[in-house]
Amino acid sequence: MNNFTANTYEMKREIMNFCKKISRGVNKPITKFIKDIEYGIASSGSCLISNISRNLNENIKLKNTIERLCGNLNNFNDTDKVYKNYIETIGDVYGDEPVALFDDSDISKIYGKKFEDLDDVIDASSLDKKITKGYHVCESVILTEKEKQPISVYSKIYSCKSKEFKSMNEYTMKSIDAVKNVLGRKFTGVFDRGYDDNKIIDYMNDNYFIIRMNDRRVFLFKVKKKNAYEEVLKRKGKIRMTLWFDDNEEREVYVSHTKVTLPHNKKDYELVFCHGLSEERPLILLTNREIHNKEDVIKV
């Protein structure tokens, strides 16, 4: 019990110190609000205002705490200042070859009826990937060099039905710009197949990228136009390697690569494919990183 109590106080002290740093230049009520939100999320493991409020254990009615936090959220206008402090507080912990991850997710509001600009989204948490009401989320993180922990540098909740909406690519490019601004140097961007888009590829050409391809993608294989998926099925992986997963599962896979050309910009890239991750389909990746040997393939 003593160790548990000590750990709790240590966690709270670290959260308070962090909040103090990212609150530089804002007034005391907003600083208190930031501390309450950060500690409430950490202690409750939830982003619901009601759960955050309960974990603050204030000597007032729960309703009053909820109303205070909601009021502060509605009137909060120090986002740019806090974000700047946040980036400065984290510092440069990304190493000489930083890796950024980009992901589109969703927030499902299954029972929501009156939320503003409710959109149709694919519920990624459901097994059948059903369509529900909710919002899209665009996120970019940079991995720390040593611990490989993700540090969020861009997070945007949006709806395709809002008046301000232009395109999903607009938010993706803003998330890429956020990484560029934070790092100020060349990095490797990792994207899932939802980002298999010529505009994204062109936008990332000044940096390194690794993008998972969809099965419909067509490339030039030695001048001839061919479907990437059909072509990869004909080729065997030449490099054997073992992958470890979080549940201590080991899987032996076979990896190889080949040069391809994109028809739309006539630029050469490396196509890396992996057999064995799924019994049904190989994993297909496109990258602008140069591959000269086995180590380069494994690195991708």
Where are these predicted regions, by residue range?
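Single, function-defining residue in the core of a domain
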Residues: M1-K35, A42-S43, N85, D96, ...
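Short, positively charged, Gly/Tyr-enriched micro-motifs
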Residues: N3, K21-T79, T144
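Generic detector of ordered secondary-structure context
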Residues: S44, K61, T132, L277-S278
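Short, contiguous clusters of charged residues that form electrostatic/catalytic patches at enzyme active sites
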Residues: S50, Y135-C138, E170-K174
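Active-site-proximal, Lys/Arg-enriched surface segment
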Residues: I66-E147
